[in-house]
Regions:
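Active-site-proximal loop/helix of nucleotide/amide-processing enzymes and allied scaffolds
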Residues: 2-26, 34, 67-69, 79, ...
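Solvent-exposed, charged helical/coil patches
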Residues: 16-54
């Protein structure tokens, strides 16, 4: 998803801006594709790793905003960090959720070191996101940490502070 395409222009700049309408089509296809792959934490983690986080050498936090059926309606990278930490603002997470009219969110972030084991800070952040979400009536369906070689950690699958199978 890029905003600039290289082409030969009369002014010699070599760049053409894509109209915002064109970008919306790309975002819609992106979200539509993700809807098919959110069935399990593993599939969702694989999709986000492959299409958004890739092999980033920095921690990224991604919010997937969902409708009442758990289908993705909006995706955003809400924070970019360093090689071993990322300060994800709960305000930024919920700003994206509110603007997109999300009923639920799924958080993803990567550990560039490859080990998806959550840190105490990861657990604290997940708990705080769940608590703020309860106040705003926006559920946290899961928080998934992506490691390397397909390794991931799902708070929901592990019934830890941020997630449980019933969303409570």
């Amino acid at each position: 998803m890029g905003a600039i395409v290289t082409t030969e222009m009369a002014d010699g700049s070599g760049h053409t801006r894509i109209p915002i309408v064109g970008l919306q089509i790309v975002v819609d296809r992106y979200v539509e594709y993700l809807r098919e792959d959110l069935a399990t934490s593993r599939k969702a983690a694989e999709w986000v790793e492959r299409n958004i986080i890739r092999r980033s050498n920095r921690e990224l936090v991604v919010a997937v905003c969902c409708d009442s059926g758990g289908r993705a309606t909006y995706i955003d990278v809400v924070a970019k960090g360093t090689v071993n930490c990322c300060l994800a603002s709960v305000v930024e997470i919920f700003k994206v959720a509110i603007i997109s009219n999300a009923v639920n969110i799924i958080l993803f972030h990567n550990h560039p070191c490859g080990d998806p084991t959550p840190s105490a800070k990861d657990e604290e952040t997940t708990k705080r996101v769940r608590e703020v979400g309860e106040l705003l009536d926006i559920g946290l369906l899961d928080h998934i940490i992506i490691g390397s070689d397909g390794a991931y950690y799902s708070f929901m699958e592990n019934n830890v502070a941020g997630g449980s199978p019933d969303g409570a």
